[in-house]
């Protein structure tokens, strides 16, 4: 430990006492000029452009760009990817939205079908499912082709051709 009350002018006036545990060392010592300046080097090395040949070799080749240069591009591409995911999610939800059907209809197989048809075909055997899909498709075609409501059990041809009035025997 160093005792702070020591005066630099009193170098040898008092011998250090071991009893108190402190040494009196001056904190500021005079500087000598010989220690301040280093001798000038005899040989000076000047770096020229010829020492940097590895950079010149890579000029013709493709250099990998730094990530810092493309920070904005990366952020924009991530934002576009995020927006694309949002758009796909909205479109998916729009297509798979649980549609509400009017009273007396049941939503099955992405269509609203009459509840009576559903009850009739669900009570039959499992092989009737193909007929069930056929009836649904005929129902949709008939609904699109005519202006009035048609039952799915009627064929489209029977509805389009109305029965002719009976001929009278008079003429």
UniProtKB/Swiss-Prot annotation:
Query: Which GO biological process annotations does it have?
Result: clathrin coat assembly; endosomal transport; regulation of postsynaptic membrane neurotransmitter receptor levels
Query: GO molecular function: any one?
Result: clathrin light chain binding
Name-wise, this protein is Neuronal vesicle trafficking-associated protein 2
The family this protein is said to belong to: Belongs to the NSG family.
Checking Pfam families in the record gives: Calcyon
- InterPro entries under this entry? NSG (IPR009431)
Entry annotated with the keyword Transferase: no
Membrane topology of this protein: Single-pass type II membrane protein
Q: Where in the cell is it found?
A: Membrane; Golgi apparatus, trans-Golgi network membrane; Cell projection, Dendrite; Endosome membrane
Which gene name does the record give?
Answer: Nsg2
Q: Which residues are listed as membrane-spanning?
A: 72-92
Keyword Membrane in record: yes
Could you list this entry's UniProt keywords, alphabetically sorted.
Cell projection, Cytoplasmic vesicle, Endosome, Golgi apparatus, Lysosome, Membrane, Signal-anchor, Transmembrane, Transmembrane helix
Q: Which organism is it from?
A: Rattus norvegicus (Rat)
A cellular component term from Gene Ontology for this protein is: endosome
